[in-house]
Design a protein with these regions (language model features):
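Active-site catalytic loop in hydrolytic enzyme cores
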Residues: 89-159, 173-182, 236-237
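N-terminal glycine-/serine-/threonine-rich phosphate-binding loop
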Residues: 1-35
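Active-site-proximal beta-strand elements of phosphoester/diester hydrolases
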Residues: 1-14, 135, 140-150, 165
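Conserved hydrophobic/aromatic positions in well-ordered beta-strands
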Residues: 4, 99-101, 213, 232-234
Length: 237
């Protein structure tokens, strides 16, 4: 199985641009990947929210929205499955979520369990976290999803023998990554699983240098350069 870790630019509050980026990655990955993974909140951009619920609910998307339906259509059209981070609206609540789509179907919808995605000192009860960390099955293989701070706050809840996919939004400087942050993330990932795929989007406002990484037993074994759009293809047996 070939998994593509997509470190592409996304723009805050610009779903149309971000959708084009997703489709572009799918077009470029035809015949090269079975599954493409994008970073946390890639659909809307991690800093898309203003913490005013009446405004924020307009940019959030329901799981059965037309936007998610278009992604489902693309998984059929291009023959590539997707894992995409997005701001989810469910009833009167908002979540930082990640949806798994394959062959036109919703395989799994994960909601971040840690609160670091929001300005929790000023947000109200509309901004929520999930409480489930179950695995899902893709191409006959069990996998687990965690979003960014989940592995820092609750690593024990993700301990498993299977592959862990870890979409994040982390905007360290390149120097900070090189001077220890990357090793810290690899070590933290190892508290949960031997094999972890971490995906970080590129952003211009604020600056996020992106990067995609494959960690094995606490060591980075494959990555793509910072500040350059790319797709890291990882073979998983």
């Amino acid at each position: 199985m070939r998994i593509g870790l997509v470190s592409y630019q996304c723009k805050n509050r610009n779903i149309a641009f971000n959708m084009k980026q997703i489709e572009l990655a799918m077009q470029r990955s035809a015949g090269k990947a079975d599954l493409l993974c994008f970073g946390e909140a890639f659909l809307q951009g991690f800093d898309a929210l203003c913490w005013d619920y009446e405004a924020d609910k307009t940019i959030a998307r329901e799981l059965l929205s037309d936007t998610i339906s278009q992604l489902r259509i693309w998984t059929i059209q291009y023959g590539i499955s997707l894992i995409v981070g997005y701001i989810e609206k469910f009833e009167e609540k908002l979540y930082s979520s990640c949806v798994v789509l394959s062959n036109g179907e919703i395989l799994y919808n994960y909601r971040r369990i840690s609160k670091g995605w929001k300005e929790f000192s000023i947000t109200d009860s509309h901004y929520c976290e999930g409480n489930q960390t179950s695995a899902f099955r893709f191409h006959g293989k069990e996998m687990t999803l965690a979003l960014c701070g989940d592995l820092w706050e609750f690593p024990d809840r993700f301990k498993a023998d299977q592959l862990l996919i870890w979409p994040v939004y982390v905007n360290y400087t390149v120097e900070e990554w090189d001077q220890g942050a990357l090793d810290d993330y690899a070590a933290q990932a190892a508290l949960a699983a031997d094999d972890v795929l971490m995906i970080n989007p590129i952003d211009r406002e604020p600056v996020n240098h992106g990067g995609s990484f494959y960690f094995h037993k606490g060591q980075p074994v494959a990555k793509i350069p910072f500040d350059k759009e790319g797709i890291l293809i990882v073979e998983i047996s």
